[in-house]
């Protein structure tokens, strides 16, 4: 589910020459989904997780009456970690264990309105990343200057990778906010048009009644005898 992280060519070449057996960087899991949950239904998802990883789950209700949903997050053992009712959005970060985590979106409380839901998963496996950094170091033991250079390169790569991941995360959230705001505006636009038409019809009917009543006041209802 994760995307591959590509390194600049000079860094890849340097690593190939100096560290022939070193492991590559492990990309973080960063996935987002948007789906429609019908009224009266519940949808659950399962995600396998490694040990001691950092999992962040963020969700938003983009469209639907009330913009609310019930959210449930459970551990591989079935223990409830998070349970929220009638929420429009939420962010949760947990340290994971080995196993499949379950998270559910529940719309059974609604009998009419379906909900459009966006959620994003971000997994940062810091344990494996630190181990890979140690694997890099053991191939350059005894070369202090080279060790310093490679550590600087590694630190720069991790910093750029973290910032790019954060930028992508923010852009995804901004798109979700924009979609929800657009849905709200379109809903308000439809309501304004509907009630404007109702007011127009009422005004026309009232005007017709007033004209009829005024006209009836000036009519001579007396019948002339022949």
From Swiss-Prot:
Highest taxon, organism lineage: Eukaryota
Question: What membrane topology term does the record carry?
Answer: Single-pass type I membrane protein
- Which keywords accompany this UniProt record? Endoplasmic reticulum, Golgi apparatus, Membrane, Protein transport, Signal, Transmembrane, Transmembrane helix, Transport
Chain ranges on the Lumenal side, renumbered to this chain: 25-193
Task: Output one GO BP term.
Answer: intracellular protein transport
Q: Where in the cell is it found?
A: Endoplasmic reticulum membrane; Golgi apparatus, cis-Golgi network membrane; Endoplasmic reticulum-Golgi intermediate compartment membrane
Question: In the record, which residues are listed under signal peptide?
Answer: 1-24
Which residue range or ranges hold the GOLD domain?
42-123
One annotated Gene Ontology cellular component of this protein: Golgi apparatus
UniProt-listed SMART domains:
EMP24_GP25L (SM01190)
Write one Pfam family the protein is assigned to: EMP24_GP25L
Record flagged with keyword Ligase? no
Stretches assigned to the Cytoplasmic side: 215-226
Q: What is its main location?
A: endoplasmic reticulum
Residue stretches in coiled coil: none
Q: Does the keyword Ribosomal protein apply?
A: no
Family from the record: Belongs to the EMP24/GP25L family.
Subunit: Interacts with TMED9 and TMED10.
| Role of this protein | Potential role in vesicular protein trafficking, mainly in the early secretory pathway. Required for the maintenance of the Golgi apparatus; involved in protein exchange between Golgi stacks during assembly. Probably not required for COPI-vesicle-mediated retrograde transport.
Q: Please give the name of this protein.
A: Transmembrane emp24 domain-containing protein 5
Organism lineage: Eukaryota, Metazoa, Chordata, Craniata, Vertebrata
């Amino acid at each position: 589910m994760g995307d591959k992280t590509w390194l600049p060519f000079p860094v890849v070449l340097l690593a190939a020459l100096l560290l022939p057996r070193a492991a590559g960087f492990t990309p973080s899991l960063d996935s987002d989904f948007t789906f429609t949950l019908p009224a009266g239904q519940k949808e659950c998802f399962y995600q396998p997780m490694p040990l001691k990883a950092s999992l962040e789950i963020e969700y938003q209700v983009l469209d639907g009456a009330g913009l609310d949903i019930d959210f449930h997050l459970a551990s591989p053992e079935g223990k409830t970690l998070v349970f929220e009712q009638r929420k429009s959005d939420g962010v949760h970060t947990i340290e994971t264990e080995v196993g499949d985590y379950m998270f559910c979106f529940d719309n059974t409380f609604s009998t009419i309105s379906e909900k459009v839901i966006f959620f994003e998963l971000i997994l940062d496996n810091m344990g494996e990343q630190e181990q890979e950094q140690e694997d890099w170091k053991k191939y350059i033991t005894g070369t202090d200057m080279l060790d310093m250079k490679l550590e600087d390169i590694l630190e720069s790569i991790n910093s750029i990778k973290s910032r790019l991941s954060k930028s992508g995360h923010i852009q995804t959230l901004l798109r979700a906010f924009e979609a929800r705001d657009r849905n709200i505006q379109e809903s308000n636009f439809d309501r304004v048009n509907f009630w404007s038409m109702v007011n127009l019809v009422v005004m026309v009917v009232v005007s017709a009644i007033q004209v009829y009543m005024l006209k009836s006041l000036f009519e001579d209802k007396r019948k002339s005898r022949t």
